[in-house]
C-alpha cells in the first residue's frame, strides 16, 4: 500500500522530522531517560508549539482536524527517534476519550490545556488480574453528592508519574465481568487518598501502581458505557502504537544494513555473506508487510470502517510478531554490542517489546481476531 500524502500532511511529516533531528537525537534521548523526571517538558512544549498535540483533534474543539492519519505520521517519526513523551497516553487515549465521551463542559475544561501542552493525562484501566480484559474491573465507584468515590487498585499505569489527571475505569454496578457496570472517571492525580508507587519500565518510560482509597472523581461520559468507550479508544491507540512500531522497525533495518556494510569478519564485510543478505531481505519484507497493514488500519480508522476492531487486532498481532522478529535479528547481527546501552539497537528492541504488550499482546489479539471473525 502506498499512501499519497496531501501537501499539509507532507508539511507535518517534514516538520516533525526536522524537530526530532535537531532536538531529539539518541544522545539527547538518553539524557532525558536518565533524568529524574524521565521526560522533557521542553520537548513537550515544542511539540505543542509545532501543533503536534493539536493535530488529531477536530477543529470544533481547537484542534487541526488531522485525525488518525496525522497521528500515524507523527508516531512513525516518534518511533524512529524513540520519543518517550506520553503522546499516545495524553493525546490519542485520554484526549480522544474526552472529545468523544465528555460533556461540553468537560471538553471546554480539559481539552485546551491538553492541546496547549499544559496538562498531561494517563489512562488507569489495567488491574493485576485483568490481563487485557477491559470489562474485568474490581475497582468500585459509588455516588456521593455530585461526585463519585473510587476504591481499588490499578496496575502498570503508563505515564502516571507525569500526569496531572487520570482517567480511571471503575465499576459502579454489576458483577466483575459485567460490561454494562463499568464507567470512566476523571481523577486529579494529586487527590487525597490516592497513593502512587512509580517505577521505570524496560524501555525507559515511567509507570506506576495506583491505590485508590476513597478518591473523589467526576464521571466522564454516561454511567455504564465505559467499556464501549475504551474499546473504541483501544482501536485508535493500537493504530498509533503500530505506527510507532513500524517507524522503529524501519530505523532498525536501516542501522543494521549500514552496520553490515562496515563490520568486517573473516577478512570481509558481514554484508557480503549470502546467508546474512537473505536474513536482511526477510527483515525488509517483514517491515514492508507491517507498513502496509499499519497504513490500512489507520486509513480505516480515519473512515470509521466496519470491522474496525477485527482489523485492529489483526494488525496488532501481525505487526507485533514482525517487530519482534526484526528486533531479534538486528540484535543478533550486531553481536554483543546490540544490547549495550551505548547503541540504539537495544533500546529499539526494548521499545518494540513494550509496545507488544500495550493494549494486548500478539497472542491475545490472535484470539480476539478469531472471536470477532467468528461473530461477523
Set out the residue ranges of the language-model regions:
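Cytochrome P450 C-terminal beta-domain/meander region
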Residues: 133-151
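Flexible, small-/acidic-enriched active-site or ligand-binding loops
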Residues: 136-138, 156, 188-222
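A short, Trp-centered hydrophobic/proline-enriched beta-strand micro-motif
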Residues: 117-128
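Short Gly/Pro-enriched turn/cap motifs at secondary-structure boundaries
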Residues: 87, 129-132, 156-158, 176, ...
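A short core secondary-structure module
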Residues: 151-194
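N-terminal glycine-rich flavin-associated loop
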Residues: 85-105
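Short beta-strand-to-turn element immediately C-terminal to the catalytic PLP-Schiff-base lysine
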Residues: 100-102, 142, 168-171, 186-188, ...
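Alpha-helical interface subdomain recognition
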Residues: 1-82, 101-105, 113, 117-118, ...
